[in-house]
Amino acid sequence: MATAASGPCAGGSPRDILWRVLGWRIVTSIVWSVVLLPVCITAFIVLSSINLFHPIQWLSDSCNDFYSSQVIFHLLLLAVVIIIISIFNVEFYTVVPSISGSRLALIARILHPQQLTHSFIHAAMGMAVAWCAAIMTKGQYSSLVVPCTGTESLDSPAAQTCLNEYHLFFLLSGAFMGYSYSLLYFINNMNYLPFPIIQQYKFLRFRRSLLLLVKHSCVESLFMVRNFCIVYYFFGHIPKAWISTALDLHTDEQAHRPLDTIGGLLNVSLLYHVWLCGVFLLVTWYSSWILFKIYATEAHVFPVQPPFAEASDECLPKVLNSNPPRIVKYLALQDLMLLSQYSPSRRQEVFSLSQPGGHPHNWTAISRECLNLLNDMTQKLVLYQEAAATNGRMYSSYSVEPKKLSSAEETAFQTPKPSQTPSVPPLVKTSLFSPKLSTPNVSSPFGTPFGSSVVNRMAGILDVNPFSGSPQSPQLIRRGPRLWTHTSDQQVSAISNPSPCASVTAEGKTVRQPSVIYSWIQNKREQIKNFLSKRVLIMYFFSKHPEASIQAVFSDAQMHIWALEGLSHLVAASFTEDRFGVVQTTLPAILHTLLTLQEAVDKYFKLPHASSKPPRASGSLVDTSYKTLRFAFRASLKTAIYRITTTFGEHLNAVQASAEHQKRLQQFLEFKE
C-alpha cells in the first residue's frame, strides 16, 4: 500500500496545514510534468516531419532539430506554459463536484469571472503552444510574414511582404483548443479530484492512464480541429483582415487558396499538422492534470497522538474536529478508514486513555466527528424527502434553529431510551442534526455565479427562483416553483406567492386583504410564466434535470463513506482490541445514528429517479464516479451495520435502543435486511 509519510504534528493556520500536506506534492507533480516535456517534444518533432520514403534521413533530421538552439528555447517556453497550467490546476481543484441543475445554470457557472479568467489564460497558453509547434514544424508554417510571390507585389516595395495564413491558422487553432480545453474542464468537472478506492503506487496509476490519455487526446483533438474549421470558415476573414491592416500586410492569394473557403480547408497537410499540434497540447496538459490528481489524492498519514501537547494541529483527532481545507479533511477521513482496517498499532492509539486523567480523548474526538457527519447526511435526506413530499414546501424547524456543537456532542453520546415517546419520527429529530457541514446545492437556473442564497446554504437542496416571492411566514420555508408546473394557477399562486396581507402575525392579528393592484400584478406574472413555459427554447435552458438534484445531495458522500467505514471497522476491532471499553460507552449512540440513517436512506431511495442509475462512461479519461456515489453510500452503510452486528452478535440485544431500532437490529442479526 503506497502511502506518504508525514512529519511531526505542528501547529499553524489552515493554510499552513494545507501547504505542509500538499506543498511537496504540488511541486513534485509540476517537476514531473516538466520532465516529461522533452519526451513529448521529441515525439512531436518526429511525427511532424514524417517521411516514410527516406526513414534514415527522417530520423537524423529529427535528431538534429531536437538539439538545435531554437528547439531548446521552445522547450524552456513550453516549460513555463506547463507551470502556469499546473498552477491553475492547483487553484481550481475541488473535492466536491459542481452540479448544475439546468443548462442556464451551467452557462452561468461558465461565465463566472474566475472561469472566464481561466478560459482566457488557457487560450493564450494554447496560442503560445501553437506558435512553438508551428516553428518546430518548419516549412510554410514557421513565419507569420512571408515574401509575396506575385509579380505585381515585386514592383512596389510596400507590398513585398504578405500574410502567411497558414501560420495565422495555426495560432488561432491553438487559442481555440486552449479555450475548448478550459470549457470542457468545467463542463466535465475535470477539476474534481476523485480519490482512488484501491491505493496503488503513483507510477502504476500514471502508467495505467497513459494509453487512455493518448487515445483521448487524439480523438478530442480531431473534434477540436473539426469545430475550429467550421468557426474559421464563417469568421476567419475577421482576424485575417484585422492583422493584415494592423501589420500592413497583403494577402497573397496566388500562393494558396484562402483558408476561409471549403477548398482552402481541404488541405490534408495543414489539417494533419494542426491536429498533431492539438494532440501535443492536450497530451502535455492532460499529463500535468493527471499527475496533480495522482499526487493530491495519495494517502497521507496523520499521527493519532502528538509528540507534544502544544503541537497537535496536524494530528488526526484535531484535524477531524477543526475546520481545515476540505481536501485535508478528506485526506484525514481517508487515513481514518485505512488505519481502522490495516493498522492495529494505530488503532491502539485510538482506544488509548490519556495520562494523567484516563480519558479517551482520541476516540471521543474521532467518533464525535464521524457521528456529526452521519447526522448531517440524515438531515439532508430528511429535508430532501420533506421537500419532495410537500411539493417544494419545507418546515423550517430542521434548519432554522441549528444546535450548538456542544449540544450536538451531548446528544450524540446520549443513550436513547425506549420509554421516551418522541413527538416527531426519529428521522426528523433536530437533536440528531449537526449543521457543521453542508453540501453544495444544485445551481439555480437564475442563480448568479457570484453567490448563493441563504436558503440554499441552509437546506442544501432548495431551488431559488426570482419569479417566486420571498417567504413571509416564519413557520415555512418554501421552494419557488419551477417555470412550468402541473398545478393550477391558484395553487401556484398560493404556494409560491404567499401574500403578506393574508398571513397571520405572531401576535394573532390578521393583516388586511391584498389590494386590486397587487392581485393584478400577481395574475400578470403568472400569465407571463405560463406563456414562457410553453416555449421550447425557454424549456431547453430552464428545464431541471431530476438527476442533478439527486446527485447534489450526495456530492460530498465520499467523506461520509469513509466515516462509515472507519467508524464501523473501529467498533468491530474494539470487540477484541479495546482493553478499556471506551467504545462500549458510545455503542448505543453509534447504532442509533446508523439505524436512523439507514431508515432515511431506505425512504430516500423510494423517491422517483433516486434508484435510476445514470449511464456509466467506461474507458473515459473524465471521471464520473460522483454520479453514482449514492449507491456506494447505501452499500457502505449496510455493510457497516452488518460489520458491527456480525462481530457483536447476540450481545447487541443488551444495548439500550428504541423498539423500532431493536426490530431493525434484529433483522440485521438474522441477515434479513
Swiss-Prot record:
Cytoplasmic side: 1-25, 93-115, 188-226, 283-673
Broad class of where this protein is predominantly found: nucleus
Gene Ontology terms for molecular function: structural constituent of nuclear pore
PTM comment text: Phosphorylated.
Keywords, sorted A to Z: Membrane, mRNA transport, Nuclear pore complex, Nucleus, Phosphoprotein, Protein transport, Translocation, Transmembrane, Transmembrane helix, Transport
Keyword Coiled coil: no
Annotated InterPro entries: Nucleoporin_prot_Ndc1/Nup
Protein's UniProt keywords contain Repeat: no
An annotated GO BP: nucleocytoplasmic transport
PANTHER family the UniProt entry points to: NUCLEOPORIN NDC1
Family note: Belongs to the NDC1 family.
Protein name according to UniProt: Nucleoporin NDC1
Species in which this protein is naturally found: Mus musculus
Gene it is expressed from: Ndc1
